[in-house]
């Protein structure tokens, strides 16, 4: 891979990283300020803040991986640093996906209209248990990732002990195929929350269809607040599903480099696509949340006023 292509993709990745940090930091900052002001936090704000923090960490890990690939390519052949990066990438990836799934589940229970006793019971208790669900997602992600990381590091530790007795440096390498297969297994686990999110999406569509049908039969129109809430929730869920599919394909592209030689370009390109998912989805969430949307418009208006004031002062001085 030429230096020109490396530099171009790296700068594009830095740009995506900056946009993603800006959007997710804005979500976290607005919700935390509201939390301090009101001394309590709503369930939806807690989910969005947790999701924003996990995605900030995910963006940092992906960008660090890009830098390591470009500046220290030998680390991808062997080394403990690679395993550490992979562990935190997989962990933050799992947390981000689980938290996004929690958001989809929350939308489903708060907006959908079903009359099954179990659904009504869950709908009534969702605000009380959402913090425990988020905590459970964190614990589950850590327990899934730690054993796999220990398996990867076991060979490394055995090699260090062997090197003290012999000079077998070749034994300190974990094969690329073994490493890639472990990463593939860890990311296949994310298909579970993806399936849950997909199920909530279809149930929301069913609820919306039934609601519109009732509105048509009662001749009250279809653009009532409940319909608008359904549409906003569906936009947030379907954007997550589409971006997650693109993210998963980018991961498969990056993982292919472990089996095909000389594919650093595929890795960087895959990571460039991977950055789109945590970066762009944050802005979709901002536009779909009334409080965040108002705060963003207020910030935008303030920035425009400052810029206009500076231009006026410069024109006055001239």
UniProtKB/Swiss-Prot annotation:
Gene: TAS2R7
Source organism (scientific name): Macaca mulatta
One GO BP annotation of this record: detection of chemical stimulus involved in sensory perception of bitter taste
Protein name, UniProt field: Taste receptor type 2 member 7
Membrane topology, from the record: Multi-pass membrane protein
Compartment annotation: Membrane
General function of this protein: Gustducin-coupled receptor implicated in the perception of bitter compounds in the oral cavity and the gastrointestinal tract. Signals through PLCB2 and the calcium-regulated cation channel TRPM5.
Any GO CC annotation of this UniProt entry: plasma membrane
Miscellaneous: Several bitter taste receptors are expressed in a single taste receptor cell.
